[in-house]
Amino acid sequence: GMGGGKAFAGGGKKEKRAVGSNFGYRKEMPDGMKILGEEYRTDRNGETYPLWKIGEMKSPAGEDLLVVSIPNLTDKNDYESWKGFIETFDRAYLENKDKWEKGRIILDVRGNGGGEDKPIDHVAKRLYGNLVNTYKRCEIKDTAVSNAFLHCHGAYKPRNYERDGLTAEKLVKRKNFSGEDRVLFDETAVYYPFNDKGGYHGRIDVLIDRGVGSSAESAYTSFYHHPNVRYVGENTAGMQQYTQGSFAMPCGYLMRVGVTKLTYWDKEGENIEVKGHKPDVDCRGKDAFEAVLQMPRDEGRILGFREKNEPVKGREVFT
């Protein structure tokens, strides 16, 4: 939490709000859980951590559950890095679609601070049967300083321009800046509708907590338009974007600086930065996975479709 007794996510009073750690970190699996696939990575300190885990089991009420745990998003955002996850999920889901339509899919991203969004994006598109709506929009104040920050973080990084066959001398640098706000990209203009024929009509439970930030928050935004989704846990961090650069300060700390305003929109049409996303079922004090196992199938669930985030400005597009 921040100072003054305030907690970071949601700005409420500092209080115990744990909803359990991600399923991927569990040492002991629930009775009857069959693991279909999992991958681990090793950090620079030699510690092993889970990247993803997919398994199936039955709930106490006898429902078939497909459990998809993504505790970390540390790999690159390409197919090769997530091939094991994609193939395991597709095999489990596509070969038993009817079974899961009658049952439930549980997506656990608790504690995931972000990185890349490939596996979440894959599951979201597969279950939607179309591209998904994230309502992402990014602006920058067009000044020399903010552009320098942005490009040093991206296009001016040697590893990025060298990959395109460029050298430092070939980079073109702008001299004139408007000083006004400029939109870098805007994904709010096109609405992708749910694919009634190819999409998933069963139940989805997404487990979230205060540790969910940056691209892991796309587990909220990417599933917002799916039917029959229930978010369970606690408020997310509301940190869609961290920063564009960092400086070492004399005291030894790093100061991180952001120059762009990246916004995602929630159902009220407000930017969720700092505010975060609220769950449908707040289960603070209980493990969210245990809570959804015990909870009636549709308790607190929005059945069918939620209201669209914003009025559909553009055209509906099937891909």
Language model features: what each stretch is:
Residues 293-294:
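Juxtamembrane/interface motifs at transmembrane-helix termini
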Residues 1-140, 151-156, 203, 218, ...:
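Flexible, low-complexity junctional segments that flank or bridge functional domains
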Residues 117-290:
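Conserved acidic, small-residue-rich alpha-beta core segments centered on
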